[in-house]
Amino acid sequence: MIYLEILVWIAIWMVAMAIIEYSIHRWTMHRKRSWLPKWIFQDHAIEHHKKERNDINIDLPLYFHILVGSPLIIASYFISLISLLTLLTVFMYHSYTWTKLHRGIHDLENNWLMKTSYFKRAKHHHELHHERPGKNFGVVFLWTDSLFRTKLK
């Protein structure tokens, strides 16, 4: 029974993480927001995209997940220990996968993910995003662009 609970929470948090990834990338990194520090838009939309600075705004460290995800961490603590541990596991997975995919896509490192067929799809998806920054916001979870109708073929 505990395994089923773990699987259910992993599924819930993976879907939540996919929507959070898409939302943050689309609505905070590609639009100036008065309530956010200016560097968020500047580093991503201007330096990384327009000036093609592939060394800026690449990594997504775990502390960012902890900071931004703190309301979810607090809520999951009150739900159950399994909810909390699976959320933290999903945060670790996403931080690692985003960083490795993004570093590989921008030729900053050669890693094991680059040998997968998923990497080829993610690279193509992300390169289209750089050509048309208003499309293809998913980095780890490519399917979110189909869901929100922002996918370029």
Residue spans for each PLM region:
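Membrane-anchoring/interfacial helices and their immediately flanking loops
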Residues: M1-S23
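Membrane-embedded catalytic scaffold of the fatty acid hydroxylase/desaturase
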Residues: M17-K153
